[in-house]
Amino acid sequence: DEKKSQIAHGETVRETANMVSFMADVIGIRDDMYIGKGHAYQKEFMEAVTEGNKDGILEQRPTLVNLQCDVDHPTQCMADMLHIIHEFGGVENLKGKKIAMTWAYSPSYGKPLSVPQGVIGLMTRFGMDVVLAHPEGYDVMPEVEEIAKKNAEKNGGSFTKTNDMAEAFKDADIVYPKSWAPFAAMEKRTD
């Protein structure tokens, strides 16, 4: 929580990053609340420790684990992928499998976009047929959709979007329901 850290008192990211790095080989950061902030902070943090290592301030550059940011949730998505690989009997059996990444209602509003974005980005890398299904207005970041499209083309899968849940569920091998806030709402929260 930045409000309880030295950042709230004017300490720079570089100062914080280097100080924490003196005490750790691995650092995990979770910063997912604001569009354009979390991933950018993680990059700035790693640039600071890389520079600190190059300048001789740090003996070594620690590894950063993205525990979740505004763009992706790689630890969750990799755990999901390992489960899927196991269930289908190996990574070679994933090509052509259909996964429906579907929006689901939750009484707690304002969930980050990182899980559905991570899923569509990762599963398309394995040649899966990924369908992103959500009500109108619940789009994810356009840049992430472009990554999913490119991954699908490169790896022999597909990426499609729909607002029709029945269409998404039809012939799906996997249905992954998850609540998330609309991209437009997340952008407003950031402003």
Predicted region positions:
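Short, well-ordered coil/turn residues at beta-beta hairpins
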Residues: R30, P177-K178
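Flexible, active-site-proximal loop/turn residues at the rims of small-molecule/cofactor binding pockets
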Residues: M33, W180-A181
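Glycine-rich phosphate/diphosphate-binding loop of Rossmann-like nucleotide-binding domains
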Residues: D1, I85-P177, F183
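Glycine/threonine-rich flexible loop motifs
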Residues: K37-H39, S108-L113, P182-D191
